[in-house]
């Protein structure tokens, strides 16, 4: 992987250099000391991934992320000291297209390889996304059991740019919206609770983390909240699971959409929002093949037109809509 580093602290840059040295396939192509330099460097030599600090002089990491994704788009991972204290900035950067966030590896404390492991896992996940590898076996579609009340479900998947897009979509849903909503956003479990709280502040409907073993609940929005996949079981409950292990990025949108296609008994809509790579495209296609309405976000309103593009390419979406039109469409379907 060709990697650019954006950080104004020499010790942090050195910590990143040492961490990356554990994986010889990674190459540092440039180092920028502020966001403005990073924008210029990306335009001249776009790397595979940028490791972006948040708090810097001249231009901070949020604005630099916005500029890079608009001018020279590439994978961006936020790497900063104490990300838990900068959650809102992290979400803002993710809204502009950053994929993930992780603490800067500690320098000179404990085992250096152990300290580097979280960052290296994030980079590995990014490699999976931008490489668009598909290591799955064929998923067997099992028809749902007959009978039971017709319940309503909206299954939404998002990645890079997702937090801001989800906020826009959820804000437009009326307080009377009576379908269950389950969100799968590519976000580390460290940020999941904070993201649920933030989305709740933007929504007329309650938003919280999904609990293992509970069913989707009408009028509530549940967010996948761990680093495992979330699936719908035959009995209608949600479960967190490490399987399938072939999916490097967790939680996987495909895993959830496919489980909805297999087991949901009522009416459902699948929605695939902005994101890098192709996660969710095959699952959305399975939902369409089961007769569910499927929607992909259009290119013009996406921060990163990757996952919806992959869905459009395989004819997985019944409708391709701008972000502003998705919530009104959901309200119309479930009126």
From Swiss-Prot:
SMART domains: REC. GO terms for molecular function: phosphorelay response regulator activity; protein-glutamate methylesterase activity; protein-glutamine glutaminase activity. Pfam families: CheB_methylest, Response_reg. Keywords: Chemotaxis, Cytoplasm, Hydrolase, Phosphoprotein. It catalyses: [protein]-L-glutamate 5-O-methyl ester + H2O = L-glutamyl-[protein] + methanol + H(+); L-glutaminyl-[protein] + H2O = L-glutamyl-[protein] + NH4(+). Its main location: cytoplasm. It is found in: Cytoplasm. GO terms for biological process: chemotaxis. Residues 144-335 form the CheB-type methylesterase domain. Phosphorylated by CheA. Phosphorylation of the N-terminal regulatory domain activates the methylesterase activity. Residues 2-119 form the Response regulatory domain. It is an enzyme of class 3 (hydrolase). InterPro entries: CheB-like (IPR008248), CheB_C (IPR035909), CheY-like_superfamily (IPR011006), Sig_transdc_resp-reg_Me-estase (IPR000673), Sig_transdc_resp-reg_receiver (IPR001789). One of its GO terms (cellular component) is cytoplasm. Its EC number is 3.1.1.61, 3.5.1.44. The modification 4-aspartylphosphate is found at residue 53. The active site is at 159, 186, 279. HAMAP family: CheB_chemtxs (MF_00099). Contains a C-terminal catalytic domain, and an N-terminal region which modulates catalytic activity. Involved in chemotaxis. Part of a chemotaxis signal transduction system that modulates chemotaxis in response to various stimuli. Catalyzes the demethylation of specific methylglutamate residues introduced into the chemoreceptors (methyl-accepting chemotaxis proteins or MCP) by CheR. Also mediates the irreversible deamidation of specific glutamine residues to glutamic acid. Belongs to the CheB family. This is Protein-glutamate methylesterase/protein-glutamine glutaminase 3. It comes from Pseudomonas aeruginosa (strain ATCC 15692 / DSM 22644 / CIP 104116 / JCM 14847 / LMG 12228 / 1C / PRS 101 / PAO1). The gene is cheB3.
